Curated annotation (Swiss-Prot):
This is Phosphoglucosamine mutase. Its EC number is 5.4.2.10. It comes from the Bacteria. Mg(2+) binds at residues 101, 241, 243, 245.
Length: 450
């Protein structure tokens, strides 16, 4: 990770860390790096989620883009994967999404996509960072007709929805689907999409007011949708995050079906249809041990990456694999989109339900999970967790006690000032005890004093 760019763009508290001034400079420098070889008036798409700070940062970012001669097409509120799809579909030179995904409302972020709809490479981000840190801004400052322009392309949302519908062979007539839109970017998209697919819909978290994004709703709070599914007697529930690149499902009896299980279900179906490239799925080190055991039983190969959907996508592109993702609900169907897509993943999952005639609980039960516990600890300097001797010592002690029947993963978050402690063991009791033992040392050594 660089000085400005984390694993998912530039993030920070809006108006104090991620300021309008920084957004303006990101527009100038990022726009220049991504479009300098395009010729006159390259086109860049700009979109945002529902955060109150989104319009402020959008205005500043667009000013920066226009100042280097870029034609901006404003999409308004749309999901991150919607932007990624439209970038390539519209032949844009690049695109920018203003969102902090699942983070709290105070945060925001800016992430760029290239003309191919993929997130930027490390080299491209490093070049932008070097320009940001240059003492004097020497980039072009055109005037008159050399300046860029701004136009609206709100109809892009409908084009994206129409595309999603073409990725499946079934409609959802006869299915009652509960949707939790996290008061975020999918709030209008999801209900429109599933209505077009002839589903019976109940929705929650679909009334954004600028302040309630991810607030007790969405993929990071699936328990809210679980209760809603039971109350509405729905066949399945789908919980998205603030920018719509994640989904967590709920089965008809209120059980959580996470990204591992969604990937497992879809991988099995794709293989049966002869559509799983190289009989391989890409996942991260956070996937449950039960996920890998289930894949072995199906004789499906796996490739494991570091945490972060960008690393999953990199491995998929390198190996020409078409399915990958994360336990957190970032799932990439590379035949259809270039990034994690909650809406796409949701309709692929329900398409499997309809094609097989099975309830989601039946499909999910085919993968058995190890007890897992994840603790997030707010710290002063997350990057020193890997070289703290006391933390290393307690991890070694726990791993020795596990004797190969479990695992420990302690790592800095790529997007927040957190250390994540993840433990899997043979029993829930052992998992809880090991996780608390390690977390206690991390808190003692590194935690912020509230």
């Amino acid at each position: 990770m660089g000085k400005y760019f984390g694993t998912d763009g530039v993030r920070g508290v809006a108006n104090s860390e991620l300021t309008p001034e920084l957004a303006f400079r990101l527009g100038r420098m990022g726009g220049y790096v991504l479009t300098r070889h395009v010729g006159e008036h390259p086109r860049v798409l700009v979109a945002r989620d529902t955060r109150i700070s989104g319009e402020m940062l959008e205005s500043a970012l667009i000013a920066g883009l226009v100042s280097v001669g870029i034609e901006v097409m404003r999409l308004g509120v749309i999901s991150t994967p919607g932007v990624a799809y439209l970038t390539k579909a519209q032949g844009a030179s690049a695109s920018v999404m203003i969102s902090a995904s699942h983070n709290p409302v105070d945060d925001n972020g800016i992430k760029f996509f290239g003309s191919d709809g993929f997130k930027l490479s490390d080299d491209q981000e490093e070049e932008i960072e070097q320009l940001l840190d240059t003492a004097e801004d020497t980039l072009p400052r055109p005037s008159g007709e050399g300046l860029g322009t701004v136009s609206d392309y709100f109809e892009g949302k409908q084009k994206y929805i129409q595309y999603l519908k073409q990725t499946i062979e079934n409609d959802f007539n006869g299915y009652h689907i509960a949707l939790d839109c996290a008061n975020g970017a999918t709030s209008g998209l999801a209900t429109h999409l599933f209505a077009d697919l002839d589903a019976d819909i109940s929705s929650m978290g679909a009334s954004p007011n600028g302040l309630n994004i991810n607030d007790g709703v969405g993929s990071t709070h699936p328990e809210a949708l679980a209760a809603f599914v039971l109350d509405k007697k729905a066949d399945v529930g789908l919980a998205f995050d603030g920018d719509g690149d994640r989904v967590i499902a709920i089965d008809e009896i209120g059980q959580i079906v996470d990204g591992d299980k969604i990937m497992f279900i879809c991988a099995k179906y794709l293989r049966e249809q002869g559509l799983l490239n190289s009989n391989t799925i890409v996942s991260t080190v956070m996937s449950n041990l039960g996920f890998y055991k289930g894949l072995r039983e199906l004789e499906i190969e796996d490739v494991q990456t570091a945490v972060g959907d960008r690393y999953v996508v990199e491995a998929m592109r390198e190996g020409n694999y078409n399915l990958g993702g994360e336990q957190s609900g970032h799932i990439i169907f590379l035949d259809h989109n270039t990034t994690g897509d909650g809406l796409l993943s949701g309709i692929q999952l329900i398409n499997v339900m309809k094609a097989t005639g099975k309830k989601l609980s039946e499909l999910a039960s085919e993968m058995k999970t190890f007890p897992q516990k994840l603790e997030n600890i707010r710290v002063s300097d997350k990057n020193h967790v890997t070289d703290n001797p006391k933390v290393s010592k307690v991890i070694s002690e726990v791993e020795a006690e596990m004797a190969g029947n479990g695992r420990v993963l302690v790592r800095p978050s790529g997007t927040e000032p957190l250390v994540r402690v993840m433990v899997e063991a043979a029993t829930k009791e052992a998992t809880d005890e090991y996780c608390e033992r390690i977390s206690a040392v991390v808190r003692s050594e590194m935690a912020l004093n509230d």
